[in-house]
Regions:
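Short beta-strand/loop motif that positions the catalytic acidic residue
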Residues: 193, 199-201
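Flexible "cap/lid" loop of the alpha/beta hydrolase fold
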Residues: 95-100, 105-135
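Conserved acidic catalytic loop of the alpha/beta-hydrolase fold
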Residues: 65-82
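Conserved HGGG/HGGXW glycine-rich cap/lid loop of the alpha/beta-hydrolase fold
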Residues: 6-56, 73
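Acidic catalytic loop of the alpha/beta-hydrolase fold
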Residues: 204-208
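Conserved alpha/beta-hydrolase catalytic His-Asp/Glu region
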Residues: 118-124, 135-191
Length: 262
């Protein structure tokens, strides 16, 4: 597959922070984070192939291809080194980016994600998601799954915007994403991640159960853990102010180092 340059949103100046969304997501889900982080950083939020503003692009069935497309896009933007934030499936893409280009990643945030793409303990199995997708179609599936990402389901203030974005995924990408996740396994490479890493998890996450989070935290050598109470899978939408504090606090040391070395 020929790798495309990905649509993206960019704002701010300084050290680069790259935001990678998850399954049925898109760059617009990071709007609040782009606004906040751009006060301190050069922020780039990408749309993975098949999703959001990239729904015209064919989605790969391998995580490594998503990672290569992100790296190609950053190359074209002239960005060499960057902080990396990956959510859900985007966390798998982020782990692939670290594996492909470890020297380019400064700090890593693995948020609501894991190292096992079959996602044991998920609200439903990948096989069942594929069945429901085939039966119900993308739009119905997108709204149904989006509800599981929020503590208050459809009653959450964030639901409509999240679900509307999810319905923009192409049918091909919705299928390809499930295939890519189920086939992916990053457990053997966790101990090789040398970047300072922040693992973030909402304690009521119905997509990624605690054993997945614990595996990241205990296996990545320089990992810290933040567990946010009373939140589900999309805590950056449920508790954005707290999420911003966690990110900025984690990146603060590097800000200080950059200032003192310039």
């Amino acid at each position: 597959m020929t790798l495309p340059s990905l649509p993206h949103r960019r704002m701010g100046a300084g050290l680069a922070v790259v935001l990678v969304h998850g399954y049925l997501g898109g760059s617009s889900q990071w709007d609040a984070q782009v606004q906040f982080l751009s006060q301190h950083f050069d922020v780039i939020a990408v749309d993975l192939a098949g999703y959001g503003n990239a729904n015209h692009l064919p989605a790969p069935t391998e995580m490594a291809a998503h990672a290569q497309a992100v790296l190609l896009t950053l190359d074209q933007l002239g960005i060499d080194r960057f902080h990396l934030v990956g959510h859900s499936m985007g966390g798998m893409v982020a782990q692939e980016i670290v594996s492909l280009a470890p020297a380019r990643v400064r700090k890593l945030v693995l948020y609501g994600t894991g190292s096992q793409g079959s996602i044991p303990g998920r609200f439903e199995t990948m096989a069942r998601s594929r069945e429901r997708l085939a039966e119900d179609g993308v739009k119905s599936t997108a709204r149904r799954i989006s509800a599981t990402w929020l503590l208050d389901n459809e009653a959450s203030p964030a639901f409509e915007s999240l679900a509307t974005l999810a319905t923009r995924a192409s049918a091909q990408a919705a299928h390809a994403g499930l295939i890519a996740m189920e086939a992916w396994d990053g457990r053997a490479r966790l101990s090789a991640i040398q970047q300072p890493t922040l693992v973030v998890w909402g304690e009521r996450d119905r997509s990624y159960a605690w054993p997945q989070i614990e595996k990241l935290w205990r296996t990545i050598p320089c990992a810290s853990l933040a567990v946010v109470p009373a939140c589900s899978h999309a805590l950056h939408l449920e508790r954005p102010a707290l999420f911003h504090i966690l990110l900025l606090e984690f990146l603060h040391l590097l800000l200080h180092e950059a200032a003192t070395s310039s």
